[in-house]
Regions:
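Catalytic Tyr-X3-Lys loop
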Residues: 97-121, 142, 169, 176, ...
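Alpha-helical segment proximal to the catalytic Tyr-Lys
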Residues: 128, 185-186, 242
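Catalytic loop of short-chain dehydrogenase/reductase
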Residues: 101-105, 136-137, 142-175, 180-189
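Conserved NAD(P)H cofactor-binding loop of Rossmann-fold oxidoreductase domains
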Residues: 82-96, 254
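Short C-terminal tail/terminal secondary-structure segment
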Residues: 97, 153, 216, 234, ...
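A conserved structural motif in NAD(P)-dependent oxidoreductases
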Residues: 218-229, 240
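Hydrophobic positions on the long internal alpha-helix
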Residues: 65, 80, 122-126, 130, ...
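Canonical Rossmann dinucleotide-binding motif of NAD(H)/NADP(H)-dependent dehydrogenases/reductases
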Residues: 1-28, 183
Length: 258
């Protein structure tokens, strides 16, 4: 398959690229900055991988991105909507998430525009061009959501950890699930399947305090590793998942079962 991965330079995105390339797929990634593109291009040097600049919250950039892809011999048949503003993203860019009452509408909207609006814009253009260029081919859309879409975070988990949860993240990821289910029904007649993955907490150099606190809430007693999530992505990209549509796959070690 030829697969698009948005936000490919993040912790999960990099792992997705690696596992999909190992399965023989061609991967086209997107990132928002030249520095991230250069970093990921140095890290992953493979003839079947390329990375292009695209802000998924910008309709102009998304349209331009797909216009470029329309000239390819093999137009992509799979879209993985992975780009999002997370607590880790805010920390990396020295943008501390504010408390609920301190959050400005502008900050709220920026998160919504990326986490939910980006899924809409990318999916819309992907569907539009797929119907023009490969209407009979089976297509897949995989949206990365979160366990916090349907399970609110436990405030006690974040006490004395230095990590903050922010409302727009949970709300936007819940919207991703709603959009996934809508697309699954309405796009099925046009040879699309649409599914969502809801990862649990993925270890990313968290403090020992946070790791232990979260692990105690998970039946498997550990946080996820990136490859725990990438295996599910690989499965949804495979032919073995062709009859799965409109589903949310929780990859959380059993956290949501409690």
């Amino acid at each position: 398959r030829t697969i698009i991965i948005t936000g490919c330079g993040g912790l999960l995105g990099i792992e997705f690229i690696k596992v999909l390339l190992s399965k023989g797929h061609t991967v086209i990634g997107t990132e928002i900055s030249d520095s991230k593109i250069n970093k990921i291009s140095e890290m992953i040097q493979d003839v079947n991988f390329s990375c292009l600049k695209c802000d998924v919250s910008s309709e102009k950039e998304v349209v331009s991105f797909f216009k470029h892809l329309s000239g390819l011999k093999n137009f992509p048949d799979t879209l993985i909507n992975n780009a999002s503003i997370t607590s880790e993203y805010l920390k990396e860019n020295d943008l501390e998430p504010l408390s609920f009452i301190e959050t400005s509408y502008q900050s709220w909207q920026k998160c919504m525009d990326t986490n939910l609006g980006g899924v809409f814009l990318m999916s819309k253009e992907f569907v539009k061009l797929s119907q023009e260029l490969a209407p009979k081919k089976a297509k897949k859309i995989i949206n990365i959501s979160s366990i916090y879409a349907l399970h609110g975070p436990n405030p006690k988990l974040y006490e004395d950890t230095g990590i903050k949860s922010f409302a727009a993240y949970s709300a936007s990821k819940a919207g991703v699930i709603g959009l996934t289910k809508w697309m699954a029904g309405f796009l099925a007649p046009y040879n699309f399947t649409c599914n969502s993955i809801a990862p649990g907490g993925v270890f990313n150099n968290h403090s020992k305090i946070f790791e232990q606190a979260l692990s105690s809430m998970i039946p498997l007693e550990r946080m996820a590793n990136p490859n725990d999530i990438s295996g599910t992505v690989s499965f949804l990209c495979s032919e073995e998942s062709n009859y799965i549509n409109g589903q949310v796959l929780y990859v959380d070690g059993g956290y949501s079962s409690r």
